[in-house]
């Protein structure tokens, strides 16, 4: 693991997700830019002292020098955004598989270079767009693909939080500090979780953006980065979309939801109540899909661990991304063909699309105009 030192929220989440299904064990890390903190975190995880590194560069070199049976099989990158690119590059160039937090990078140039490096070195690269791991999101994706909604006409995705409704970064709070720092975050609400909204819309509907118009704001006085954005989107095939993301919605915790309206039916899913997927018809009762039932598509069944009526949540969704990627990595190491179901995870090309979306939305917000949002990342 690179990142995830003392006091970091996301590092522990990544570790629990990676180990939930017994497919991986943490054996090495460069957990902090402060060597003392990296050692402290390594001790907390019970790692051998010679596998705890001071920098990601030292770790990439050190692990590559070990025999194949001893070195890491893949690396989790859970640093602030500005370190995703150099960390991933260092490991990819040495042939290591990578699972990286989002957004992929802070610039499109870096994102595209990672796409080319992944293809050149033929490594597995997974991006943790966590919400794509929920079983009911996979069910929604399958329903849209099967034509259960008819032709998609409208997509509405909301992602609202309220934790930055005040200048929390001025109090010394660690997460608020780096997430509102343009040098480390790259972008604010759009980069932090607007990319989740963009990816969720694309993942569920299969539709790519063509044009967008963004109203991007900084609501908290003195803040150096956007904290609220509202976007109108034109998708391929004529569908229209509304995406909005906000960090200043007082009282909201993690309100991510998606509604998709087709010519014959619609669906709705809420991340804060993730075990229910609603499908509505104009002339019949509402259908409610729930995990743990045999009528669900294989991808939704694969992502469910408990019997019906036993709620699962964010950690399990996170683990679904990890476990799929890890099974593909294991198949690659064994020289086997992976199960097609395991290929259902966000990739480096999804990451590049997310970075392109961020920059396109910010440009539209700055210029006050509709902009071309179509994009085909390299590395196909």
For every predicted segment, state its role.
Residues 94-96, 121-123, 239:
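A short helix->loop->beta-strand "cap" motif at the edges of active sites that frequently abuts
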Residues 1-47, 326:
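N-terminal Rossmann-like dinucleotide-binding module
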Residues 193-275:
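Glycine-rich, aromatic-lined ligand/substrate-binding cores of catalytic
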Residues 230, 235, 264-345, 380:
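C-terminal glycine/acidic-rich active-site capping loop/insertion
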């Amino acid at each position: 693991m690179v990142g995830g030192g003392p006091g970091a929220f996301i590092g522990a989440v990544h570790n629990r997700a990676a180990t939930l299904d017994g497919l991986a064990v943490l054996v090495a890390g460069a957990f902090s830019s402060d060597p003392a903190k990296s050692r402290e975190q390594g001790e907390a995880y019970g790692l051998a002292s010679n596998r705890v590194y001071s920098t990601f560069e030292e770790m990439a070199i050190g692990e590559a020098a070990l025999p194949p049976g001893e070195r890491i099989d893949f690396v989790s990158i859970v640093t602030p955004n500005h370190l995703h690119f150099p960390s991933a590059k260092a490991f990819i160039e040495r042939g290591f598989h990578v699972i990286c937090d989002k957004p992929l990078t802070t610039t499109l140039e870096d994102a595209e270079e990672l796409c080319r490096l992944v293809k050149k070195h033929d490594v597995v690269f997974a991006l943790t767009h966590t919400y794509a791991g929920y079983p009911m999101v996979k069910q929604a994706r399958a329903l849209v693909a099967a034509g259960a909604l008819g032709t998609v006409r409208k997509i509405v995705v909301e992602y609202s939080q309220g934790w930055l409704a005040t200048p929390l970064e001025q109090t010394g709070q660690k997460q608020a500090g780096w997430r509102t720092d343009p040098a480390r975050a790259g972008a604010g609400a759009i980069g932090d979780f607007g990319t989740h909204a963009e990816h969720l819309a694309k993942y569920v509907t299969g539709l790519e953006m063509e044009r967008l118009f963004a109203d991007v704001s900084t609501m908290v006085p003195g803040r150096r980065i956007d904290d609220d954005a509202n976007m109108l989107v034109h998708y391929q095939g004529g569908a229209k979309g509304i995406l909005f993301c906000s960090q200043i919605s007082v009282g909201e915790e993690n309100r991510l939801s998606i509604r998709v309206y087709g010519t014959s039916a619609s669906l709705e899913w809420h991340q804060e109540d993730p075990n229910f997927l609603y499908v509505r018809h104009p002339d019949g009762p509402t259908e409610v899909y729930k995990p743990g039932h045999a009528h669900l598509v294989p991808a939704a069944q694969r992502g469910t661990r408990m019997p019906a009526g036993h709620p699962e949540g964010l950690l399990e969704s996170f683990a679904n991304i990890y476990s799929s990627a890890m099974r593909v990595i294991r198949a690659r190491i064994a020289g086997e063909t992976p199960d097609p179901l395991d290929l259902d995870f966000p990739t480096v090309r999804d990451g590049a699309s997310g970075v392109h979306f961020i920059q396109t939305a910010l440009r539209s917000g700055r210029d006050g105009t509709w902009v071309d949002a179509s994009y085909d990342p390299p590395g196909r």
